[in-house]
Structures are given as C-alpha cells and as structure tokens.
Amino acid sequence: MANFVLNAQARAEDKQGKGASRRLRRESLVPAIIYGGNAEPVAVTLELRELVKALESNAFFEEVVEIKVGDKVENVKIQALQRHPAKNTPMHADFKRA
C-alpha cells in the first residue's frame, strides 16, 4: 500500500489558530489539516522530526501517504506545504484524501 506512514493527533477547537499553532511549533510539532472526500476536514498535529524524515524523499509528494489519527487511518496525498522562509522547516501541511 503506502510507503509512508505518519502518526498524527487530532487537534481540538481550542488548539487551532495563530497562537495555538505557534505554541505547537515551539514544541516541535507541525499543524496540518486533512480535507476532501465526503468526510469533514480534520485538524491534526504531526511530529516535526517524522515529517522532515518523510520529506527527504521526492516520492512523498507523488505517492499516497497513510496518516494514523488515533485508531483511524486516512489515505491522503500532500496538497500544500508551507515552510519557514529562513529555516526551511515545515510550518503547516495540507493533505487531501485520496
């Protein structure tokens, strides 16, 4: 199936927004969203180290990725990735359901 498997945690409503995202980034976490298909969008948090490791491969941008959110598995493709302008570290990721 997918070569890339990422573990994520769902974010509550109070953990969304500019200030909350900044706090997550200070803890080496990356805010992300999963959308598309018939299901509602899901705000998730990924570990920075795990995402950077996956980004080292160019295939990550072309293949279907599995994201485990709790006990649920989402098959997604990366839609957009925002990086820090100076550090080049991921700041936010958008995933679209496949």
Swiss-Prot record:
InterPro entries: Rbsml_bL25/Gln-tRNA_synth_N (IPR020056), Ribosomal_bL25/Gln-tRNA_synth (IPR011035), Ribosomal_bL25_short (IPR020055), Ribosomal_L25_dom (IPR029751), Ribosomal_uL5_bac-type (IPR020930). Pfam families: Ribosomal_L25p (PF01386). One of its GO terms (molecular function) is structural constituent of ribosome. Coiled coil: none annotated. Residues 1-23 are annotated as: Disordered. SUPFAM superfamilies: Ribosomal protein L25-like (SSF50715). Keywords: Ribonucleoprotein, Ribosomal protein, RNA-binding, rRNA-binding. One of its GO terms (cellular component) is cytosolic large ribosomal subunit. GO terms for biological process: translation. It comes from the Bacteria. Gene3D superfamilies: Ribosomal Protein L25, Chain P. NCBIfam families: PRK05943.1. Part of the 50S ribosomal subunit; part of the 5S rRNA/L5/L18/L25 subcomplex. Contacts the 5S rRNA. Binds to the 5S rRNA independently of L5 and L18. Belongs to the bacterial ribosomal protein bL25 family. This is one of the proteins that binds to the 5S RNA in the ribosome where it forms part of the central protuberance. This is Large ribosomal subunit protein bL25. It comes from Acinetobacter baumannii (strain ATCC 17978 / DSM 105126 / CIP 53.77 / LMG 1025 / NCDC KC755 / 5377). The lineage of its organism: Bacteria, Pseudomonadati, Pseudomonadota, Gammaproteobacteria, Moraxellales.
